[in-house]
Amino acid sequence: MIEVRNLTKSYNVLEKPAVKDVSLCARAGEITILLGPNGAGKSTTIKSIANLLNYEGEILICGYPNNTIEAKKCFSYVPEIPMLYDVLTVDETIEFIGRAYRVKHYKEIADRYLEAFKMTENRKKLAKELSKGMRQKLSMILAFMIEPKGYNV
């Protein structure tokens, strides 16, 4: 499901790479864990898989390059610090992501998760008005809403 080939990422050309020549395969139906000490490149690898960083190498998700909408619909990433559009309401954020990922029935799917996460009363709030915990819940709702084959939480 996720295939990483020869991933190399340098943040500064004068320093050693954060990740050098990493290859891995995470198969469908399996739980894959990146384990290592601080500074080993775990977060850099995950952010590269999620296509949040520029890198060298190749990353495929469900057979698609990780920068394609097809790949993004297969894999959801919930970052430690939620990355939301502060000027959008919860409902507007849901609509934006639902349309961007071409999710059929995204409103109905989101409604189920909003109820499950006890977020229905926050629908009209701007993302910047939400507490850190509520922002994290919204990030998870967005990740679940696209119904991917894999998650990174």
Regions found by a protein language model. Name each.
Residues 57-73:
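Conserved ABC transporter NBD signature motif
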Residues 95, 99-122:
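Conserved ABC ATPase "signature" region
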Residues 140:
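Hydrophobic anchor residue at the start of the ABC signature
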Residues 50:
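Helix-to-loop junction immediately C-terminal to a conserved catalytic motif
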Residues 36-41:
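Walker A (P-loop) phosphate-binding loop of ABC-type ATPase nucleotide-binding domains
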Residues 126-133:
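Conserved ABC ATPase signature
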Residues 1-4, 8-21, 28:
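A short, flexible loop at the N-terminus of ABC-type nucleotide-binding domains that lies
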